[in-house]
């Protein structure tokens, strides 16, 4: 099912386009430390400007818990947008109310304003109808380009669409196209690389991708629960004991479906979970009882490289080791390079895998770098995202 996009809307000229973006960017001492999500919104903003729209941007930032907290103000985003667009992006002091609506009504074609954080109101996350109606008064048409928040049925992602004609922006369209393609009709061989620390947060994705993949690579902290379920010793590594049976039945199902599962065959371990710990190589599935698994070893990487080289489609979500500690980031870094050099369709999603791709300047070699963390996960789990559902044709 495809979605309606900005190209399906007749005329934006002179109209206020209320654009829901995902400007939930990391801030360090009030400065934006990664502007990927802001840059991802630019194609839609530029298109609307070209078409003569008056652009009213809305977003959330952080978790202010329904109260006005200037620590979570979108002011730094307005400054960054002004710089990137080469025009003044006016920051308004609220997101609802007569004064704000009057400001939007006085805009000229091509003007861009940013409203204050929608999560300064508790009604936003409750998808309160009255709040959604007040938000909608700032626009004549609603454009949802916030894929990163599409899995949330909030007032600014879903509620507003009850009051305004609604279409998706280019980012929303791109995410829906690439992730949808992978789930519906992937070119084969199709390799899913799933990392991260917990089985509990990734098991639904693994189960959804299992029936579609030819190879599933499991890495990161969650791999140790899978190894334990096969009878290997994992030392002091992370173990989710309540998921041992689930891991075991997943591996059994993979065998029945003739899907190859790659688990770590060797490890980089440490005495304790610390960025200053000394890395030590273990050439075995088994980890000594006083050690913690921190990254995959060279043999595992060679196995992964073999399947990546012949892959026609790759989806990668989650790191293969403790990526945030430099000494244990090699596995994730090498997989990032392997995925980037693959000639097939490559999709990377999830905070740490995206960070790895960006850190090594490889994002332009990936077919699609997904901007949605939780949203990408839920999409890959096969869930219908509320923010996308309201845009379907």
Swiss-Prot record:
Database matches in CDD domains: Phosphoglycerate_kinase
Domain of life: Bacteria
Biological pathway: Carbohydrate degradation; glycolysis; pyruvate from D-glyceraldehyde 3-phosphate: step 2/5
InterPro entries associated with the record: Phosphoglycerate_kinase, Phosphoglycerate_kinase_N, Phosphoglycerate_kinase_sf
N-terminal signal peptide: none
Residues engaged in binding ATP: 202, 293, 324, 350-353
Locations listed in the record: Cytoplasm
Pfam family, one: PGK
Residues the entry annotates as binding substrate: 22-24, 37, 60-63, 119, 152
GO cellular component, one term: cytosol
UniProt entry keywords in alphabetical sequence: ATP-binding, Cytoplasm, Glycolysis, Kinase, Nucleotide-binding, Transferase
Subunit structure: Monomer.
Protein's recorded name: Phosphoglycerate kinase
UniProt source species: Borrelia garinii subsp. bavariensis (strain ATCC BAA-2496 / DSM 23469 / PBi) (Borreliella bavariensis)
Lineage of source species: Bacteria, Pseudomonadati, Spirochaetota, Spirochaetia, Spirochaetales
């Amino acid at each position: 099912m495809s979605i309606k996009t900005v190209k399906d809307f007749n005329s934006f000229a002179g109209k206020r386009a209320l654009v829901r973006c995902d400007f939930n960017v990391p801030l360090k001492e009030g400065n934006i430390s990664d502007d990927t999500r802001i840059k991802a919104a630019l194609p839609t903003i530029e298109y609307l400007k070209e078409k003569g729209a008056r652009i009213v941007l809305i977003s959330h930032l952080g978790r202010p818990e329904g109260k006005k907290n200037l620590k979570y103000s979108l002011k730094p985003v307005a400054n960054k947008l002004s710089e990137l667009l080469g025009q003044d992006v006016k920051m308004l002091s609220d997101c609802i109310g007569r004064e704000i609506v009057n400001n939007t009504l006085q805009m000229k074609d091509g003007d861009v304003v940013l409203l204050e954080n929608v999560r300064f109101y508790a009604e936003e996350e409750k998808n309160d109808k009255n709040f959604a109606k007040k938000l909608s008064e700032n626009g004549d048409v609603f454009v949802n380009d916030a894929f990163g928040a599409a899995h949330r049925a909030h007032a600014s992602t879903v509620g507003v669409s009850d009051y305004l004609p609604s279409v998706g922006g280019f980012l929303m369209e791109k995410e829906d196209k690439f992730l949808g393609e992978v789930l519906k009709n992937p070119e084969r061989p199709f390799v899913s690389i799933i990392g991260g620390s917990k089985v509990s947060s990734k098991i639904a994705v693994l189960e959804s991708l299992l029936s579609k993949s030819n190879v599933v690579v499991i890495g990161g902290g969650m791999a140790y629960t899978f190894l334990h379920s096969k009878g290997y010793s994992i030392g002091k590594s992370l173990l989710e004991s309540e998921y041992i049976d689930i891991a075991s039945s997943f591996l059994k199902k993979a065998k029945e479906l003739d899907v190859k599962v790659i688990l770590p065959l060797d490890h980089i371990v440490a005495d304790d979970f610390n960025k200053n710990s000394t890395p030590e190589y273990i050439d075995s599935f088994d980890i000594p009882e006083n050690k913690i698994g921190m990254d995959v070893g060279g043999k595992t990487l060679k196995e992964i490289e073999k399947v990546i080289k012949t892959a026609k489609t790759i989806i990668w979500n989650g790191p293969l080791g403790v990526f945030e500690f430099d000494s244990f980031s090699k596995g994730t870094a090498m997989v990032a390079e392997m995925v980037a050099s693959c000639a097939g369709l490559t999709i990377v999603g999830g905070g740490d895998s995206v960070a790895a791709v960006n850190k090594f300047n490889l994002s332009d070699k990936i077919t699609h770098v997904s901007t949605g963390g939780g949203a990408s996960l839920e999409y890959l789990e096969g869930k219908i995202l509320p923010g996308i559902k309201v845009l379907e044709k």
